[in-house]
């Protein structure tokens, strides 16, 4: 007959194992494109199918991604639809090469892909874009740009569309982004948005490597 002590030890171990299983079940990992909801947040993970990329959803607004190789991806958590709000993010962002950390999203009618870039790797994403002006928000000047994309992937399939960019001069990997300040600045420069589709705090990588673990709220 087992002793009370051994029974207690068994149940303690079983309880710990159950807790660990429950914690693991909160993480959903993907290596191919996926969208949906996770713990109260919308998530989007797009990849061109190249390279070695693993995206994982964590508790609440947390996500992580690791990547390497010759591929392109955009991944993160946020809201659907997007819009004017204060977006808070924190965590670790460790790129090696071409990568961005941004508030990222789309509108429709017109079809616009937009970036509020908070940090980036070795390549400034505004390179080759047309500068339209600046806006000061959340403790930094942001440079505003537009660029055109022809026959490229979009939320409406392969399409031609415009990209809007706000690129922060003082890079950071945590803080609060007041998105409405950027949307208003863009509008004042004739850069109209349409109806909001999703908006996420995204990590993007292109022919690079790195890791990120970001929590959004």
Swiss-Prot record:
InterPro entries: ConA-like_dom_sf, GH11/12, GH11_AS_1, GH11_dom, Glyco_hydro_11. Residues 29-217 form the GH11 domain. The keyword Cell inner membrane does not apply. Pathway: Glycan degradation; xylan degradation. One of its GO terms (biological process) is xylan catabolic process. Optimum pH is 5.0. It comes from the Eukaryota. Keywords: Carbohydrate metabolism, Glycosidase, Hydrolase, Polysaccharide degradation, Secreted, Signal, Xylan degradation. One of its GO terms (cellular component) is extracellular region. Its EC number is 3.2.1.8. GO terms for molecular function: endo-1,4-beta-xylanase activity. PROSITE patterns: GH11_1, GH11_3. The active site is at residues 113, 204. It is found in: Secreted. SUPFAM superfamilies: Concanavalin A-like lectins/glucanases (SSF49899). Coiled coil: none annotated. Endo-1,4-beta-xylanase involved in the hydrolysis of xylan, a major structural heterogeneous polysaccharide found in plant biomass representing the second most abundant polysaccharide in the biosphere, after cellulose. PANTHER family: ENDO-1,4-BETA-XYLANASE A-RELATED. Belongs to the glycosyl hydrolase 11 (cellulase G) family. This is Endo-1,4-beta-xylanase A. It comes from Penicillium citrinum.
């Amino acid at each position: 007959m087992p002793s009370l002590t051994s029974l207690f030890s068994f149940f303690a171990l079983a309880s710990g194992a159950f807790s660990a299983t429950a914690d693991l079940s909160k993480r959903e990992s993907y290596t191919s494109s996926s969208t949906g909801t996770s713990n109260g947040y919308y998530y989007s993970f797009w990849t061109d199918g190249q390279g070695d990329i693993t995206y994982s959803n964590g508790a609440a607004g947390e996500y992580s991604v690791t990547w390497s190789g010759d591929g392109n991806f955009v991944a993160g958590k946020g809201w659907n639809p997007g819009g004017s709000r204060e977006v808070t993010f924190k965590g670790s962002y460790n790129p090696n090469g071409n990568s961005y950390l941004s508030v990222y999203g789309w509108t429709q009618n017109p079809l616009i892909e937009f970036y509020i870039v908070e940090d980036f790797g070795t390549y400034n994403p505004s390179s080759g874009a047309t500068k339209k002006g600046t806006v000061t928000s959340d403790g930094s000047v942001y440079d505003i740009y537009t660029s055109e994309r022809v026959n490229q992937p979009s939320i409406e399939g392969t399409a031609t569309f415009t990209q809007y960019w706000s690129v922060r001069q003082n890079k950071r990997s945590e803080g609060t982004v007041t998105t409405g300040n950027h949307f208003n600045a863009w509008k004042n420069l004739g850069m109209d948005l349409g109806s909001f589709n999703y908006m996420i705090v995204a990590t993007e990588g292109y022919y690079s490597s790195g890791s990120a673990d970001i929590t959004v709220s």
